[in-house]
Amino acid sequence: MFDAARLVFIDETSTNTAMVRLRGRCPRGIRLIDHVPHGHWKTITFIAGLRRRAMVAPFVLDGPMNAISFMAYLQRCLVPTLKRGDIVMMDSLPVHKVAGVREVIEAAGARLRYLPKYSPDLNPIEQAFSKLKAHLRKAAERTIPRLSRRIGVLTTKFSPDECASYFRHAGYAST
């Protein structure tokens, strides 16, 4: 048995400067009109950890995740938040399995576990990312600096009760 408070789920997601709301409302009989960006946009990668009480170690990367950037994230952002006995859970993305990942996490006194392949429903941070992206669509930021700042603000908006509900939804008892 494990204590859900010791679990730290990490994952990454991409966002871009062309994110807009996908649906809208207006009075019946009136056409809904909104501005939608077209042309070139920039994509960034956001990676973070989710504990039962908070989102931790948020990091924005201008570009795709690779082995070097993932190791840098672990060493600079995630490991300082880990406590002895924590269990770091992540999916089986190839960059999560490069040499040194397990050693960095275990040196902090934590354990590493991989989720089964094709099982986003077992990772509660997926629910948090869904909410984050909905807020990003609403904000419709068009530059990388503004998008990064908005992500930083939004990561502080996840309440302890909300994080616990993501854990329950994914099947992890909130003890």
Features from the language model and the residues they span:
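Short functional hotspots at interaction and active-site rims
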Residues: M1-T175
